Amino acid sequence: MNEFPRTTVGGVSLPRMLMGTNWMLGWSHTSASADEMIRRRYQSVEAFKPVLDAYLRHGVDAIMAPFDGPSQHLLEAIRDTEQKLGRRIILIDTPTINVDDNPQARQEAQAKIQESARRGATFCLLHHSCAEQLVDKNKGVIRRLDDYTKMIRDAGMIPGLSAHMPELIVYSDQNGYDVETYIQIFNCMGFLMQVEIETVASIIHHAKKPVMTIKSM
């Protein structure tokens, strides 16, 4: 088995390429028809297995997905592929949690995070759609982030942030939050990026923790 080059994130060995899932779970970011085409192609457990098998045979043994979404067939395919090849696949979960500032919302968030741990996730990176609700650009902070990273640590996972907004990386580094890694959009076309390519490249280069780039191809 050929091994893809590796690095270390939060004390865990990861391949320098990750398995992405937008084009297996139905998020093309281009059109509704493209989304539907993807969902039709990957509508069974068996449909996922050749993709997982190919990656794993080349040493790419980590996959990123919002496993709280429409991904039950994918999870089953992951378990079957692990059994077939005798190698574990590292789960990088990006759940969407309720970040409202009240006791009920915190209970819901904790339950979602605990579900992620029960699924076997090693990393839990809050999805950008909820994490970015906490950003205060005026103060340069991510409000109440420590509440959620503690929940993640208490559940036995490694905390991180999924970001479309590059300020999440900057503010997290500046404030020393308990965050071991980031996700950030980066590609040479600027596709779905919120600020200039050069600015994001500089932010990634100077980040204090490893950055997993998405939508690169």
Regions found by a protein language model. Give the residues of each.
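Structural motif corresponding to the early beta-alpha repeats
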Residues: 68-69, 87-105
